[in-house]
UniProtKB/Swiss-Prot annotation:
Family: Belongs to the phosphofructokinase type A (PFKA) family. ATP-dependent PFK group I subfamily. Prokaryotic clade 'B1' sub-subfamily.
Originating species: Aquifex aeolicus (strain VF5)
Protein's UniProt name: ATP-dependent 6-phosphofructokinase
Binding site for Mg(2+): E102
Reported cofactor(s): Mg(2+)
Active-site annotation: D127
Gene expressing this chain: pfkA
Amino acid sequence: MRIGILTAGGDAPGMNAVIRAVVRSAEREGHEVIGIKRGYKGLIEGDFIKLTSRDVGGILDRGGTILLSSRDPRYKKLEYREKAYKNLNEQGIEALIILGGEGTLAGAKLTAEETGIPVIGVPCTIDNDVGGTEYCIGYDTALRNAVDAIDKIRDTASSHERIFIVEVMGRNRGFIAVEAGLATGAELILIPEERFPREQIPEEIEKAKKLGKLHFIIVLAEGYCRAKELEDFLLEKIGDKYGEIRSTVLGHIQRGGIPTHFDRIMGTKFGVVAYESLIAGERSGFVAYEKGKFYIEDFEKAQEYKPIDREAYKLNTRLAI
């Protein structure tokens, strides 16, 4: 079998572990893997490269993706998808493994339906917001990066008795904010799912100061509001009454760096399951992980709402005294 593999959308640490596992599993059993560079863009433009076990040597500890990635809105148009399908046919690709988040998996579903070839997705996103699976590749590393940064910010916030707003990724969901906030002892976590009233934030700061706290850390998911917006609001409401107010956006630092051991191991397991499911005859779906078990889930599930750990959120509120 000739298997195509691509990574699309935002990169996630651990993608290389998935690629390595697929290539080596396939080669061991006499199958061939063709890398498609820059995601759906490469599929449209015919940017293909043969991958061997040597090509994927020494990549487990590398962040990002050796296949490169992009977001290409052209793939939403049938004329460009037909061009991509023509390229697949000319390359003799009989099956696809597609790595990415919700949007990428929606494209994978469409590809499976329109081409009839087997397509298996692997959920890879630092936001951890793909429905139908407990875990998405890249989340653990992003969480580590956020925690490391917030720990460092607390050092300087403490030294200068400041109020710090730290914005983390999470356009629609607060997974990183909740766990990073709990792990670093944030005084307040703000996420789109809970919508803590903005007007009450000055009260929380005042309450903390009365309890003897010398500094105050707010971990803010970008989907709640932007850090500068909240900084301006607090400056208007309380000024520097309780200490200087500063904001920091962690941004893409959360995406990069050496993948954690967990993302390397999970990436390897996700990759092997994706490959084995193709060989076993699966035609369409993505690799899901739930309660210690891997299985193939319907693509539709990827778009379903995935709840955050509200117990963790409430626990942080209880302990932030």
